[in-house]
């Protein structure tokens, strides 16, 4: 592989044991790949302090390990956004790898992403972000069912499929575009897709957690999904208005059918149609203003000066600590 400066960005919250194990896996997985990455953990306001001796051991591949400490807990996606801006402003590189600290993003798959990154450059697309498309998930059945339901709802409301997560390789020229995309504050992958930044994906199976259990539950999945929907706010609002318009047509047809049936002396069916039309009408009266408020709120937010990651993310950085090599 060609010589390059590679940064590995890893957000973490109270997951120090897994993060420490991940460093060893990174060092071993990349030992024969001519990669000497610099690792940057983003400490998302952990309530548990970094344990003594974290990353305090010799590495053969890793060039350095730093911990970017945030002033407060922001959440996984926003920690990634702060990390992206920090790397752009302070660590100019050829490629930035974004991955999670729990081990489900396997270090052994980084060379596959880098190889696709190189292939994109050879094909004349050097600015393409390369995502890992999840070919297989290992979570429990209930979570997989909820996730499948989320994917269906996401497709219906946004028109885009949920294909990728955080695990990716970002060229520096694409990073320069992402740091001015406000939506990365809510959802990294959705922001990339919505902003039309060039990207591609390759199928990669999800790994197992190194230690402990996944913190992703129904509430966390719901919040994660809502963050993605917010990125598509205008599209979601427009699709809801279309759905309401179709429902209004059905309402009119039901009323017309009820009147027609009434005059053909089938009163029981007419009464049933009237009840259905009344219930649907009440629901529509509540849905119409909600959809209109959503659409105009999103459109109005484009006029006002909003959150700009490049300008605002540095406010959340507390300090940077070098943990390897020790001073």
PLM features per residue range, with description:
Residues 176-236:
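Catalytic donor/gating beta->alpha subdomain of glycosyltransferases that bind UDP-sugars
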Residues 15-30:
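Short, well-formed alpha-helical segments that are part of the catalytic scaffolds
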Residues 5-7, 38:
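Cell-envelope/extracellular polymer assembly enzymes that use nucleotide-activated donors
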Residues 43-52, 103-104:
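A conserved acidic beta->alpha catalytic loop
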Residues 238-324:
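Membrane-embedded multi-pass helical conduit in multi-pass membrane proteins
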Residues 92-104:
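Short beta-strand-to-loop acidic/aromatic patch adjacent to the donor-nucleotide binding site
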Residues 70-72, 76-86, 104-186, 208-209, ...:
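Acceptor/aglycone-binding surface of glycosyltransferases and processive sugar-polymer synthases
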Residues 35-46, 68:
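Short beta-strand/loop segment that forms part of the nucleotide-sugar
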């Amino acid at each position: 592989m060609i010589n390059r400066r590679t940064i590995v960005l890893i957000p973490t919250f109270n997951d120090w044991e897994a993060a420490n194990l991940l460093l060893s896996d990174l060092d071993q997985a990349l030992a024969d790949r001519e990669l000497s990455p610099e690792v940057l953990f983003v400490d998302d306001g952990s309530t548990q302090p970094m344990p003594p001796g974290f990353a305090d051991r010799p590495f053969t591949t890793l060039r350095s390990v730093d911990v970017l400490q945030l002033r407060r807990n922001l959440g996984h996606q926003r920690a990634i956004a702060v990390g992206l801006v920090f790397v752009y402003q302070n660590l100019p590189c050829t490629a930035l790898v974004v991955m999670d600290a729990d081990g489900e993003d396997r270090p052994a798959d980084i060379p596959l992403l880098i190889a696709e990154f190189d292939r994109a450059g050879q094909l004349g697309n050097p600015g393409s972000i390369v995502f890992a498309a999840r070919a297989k998930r290992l979570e429990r059945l209930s979570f997989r069912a909820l996730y499948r339901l989320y994917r269906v709802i996401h497709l219906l409301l946004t028109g885009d499929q949920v294909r990728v997560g955080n695990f990716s390789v970002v060229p520096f020229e694409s990073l320069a575009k992402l740091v001015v995309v406000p939506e990365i504050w809510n959802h990294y992958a959705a922001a990339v897709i919505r902003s039309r930044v060039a990207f591609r994906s390759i199928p990669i199976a999800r790994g197992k957690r190194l230690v402990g259990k996944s913190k992703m539950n129904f509430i966390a999945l719901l919040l994660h999904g809502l963050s993605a929907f917010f990125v598509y706010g205008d599209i979601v609002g427009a699709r809801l208005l279309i759905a309401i318009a179709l429902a209004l047509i059905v309402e009119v047809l039901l009323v017309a059918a009820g009147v027609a049936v009434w005059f053909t002396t089938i009163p029981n069916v007419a009464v049933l149609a009237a009840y259905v039309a009344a219930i649907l009408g009440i629901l529509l009266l509540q849905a119409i203003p909600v959809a209109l408020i959503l659409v105009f709120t999103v459109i109005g937010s484009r006029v006002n000066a909003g959150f700009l990651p490049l300008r605002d993310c540095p406010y959340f950085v507390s300090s940077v600590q070098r943990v390897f090599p020790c001073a």
